[in-house]
């Protein structure tokens, strides 16, 4: 039942992007659901992470704020799998990640499931790079207005909706991705979300990213308990 709900949610998201007719988008759905159906091996995920990911994302998956590299520790399992599938099918643009998922060791749904479980089991990020605090109150207001209904009040994300946790994430990475959303450079997102970001002013994006980078707390992913 849970997997069926995920499938329905995912298909609805792809329909709202207008890209469901594309072969890439269809394939992302198929690959994501395949990976979620597999029994994940966190130990294999740890080995894969050490071999394939640690160079950019760091030994504890804390990312690198100064280089716009996101923290992955404690991130939602379903979301990680979906993004790896999207990179694999070039439904999300990131040249370095296209190279990573083209490697044999990281090219299959089983590897994505293993990596996602390992990452979700890690302690949450700490010491995220933040902004200057100038627009924090504006950022909090923007979050409550535009983001909390999907990402939850505390930005923990949602297991069933492929909605990522945003808290403890690096400020510069968040700003970059929000600008990508506003510019239409993220193909695998809901059109309403992209439209919301197109309507945000620069100081609202700055404040929103700064506010999220300072939010603390663990993420408890129900999918990891199955």
Please tell me what each predicted stretch does.
Residues 23-48, 64-68, 117-142, 221, ...:
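Electrostatic cytochrome c docking/interface patches
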Residues 1-39, 85, 214-226:
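N-terminal export/targeting leaders of redox proteins
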Residues 45, 53-59, 115, 144-154, ...:
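The canonical Cys-X-X-Cys-His
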Residues 65-71, 87-122, 127-133, 160-165, ...:
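Axial heme c-ligation environment in periplasmic c-type cytochrome domains
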Residues 35, 46, 58, 62-92, ...:
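Gly/Gly-Pro-rich "capping" loops immediately C-terminal to redox-active cysteine motifs
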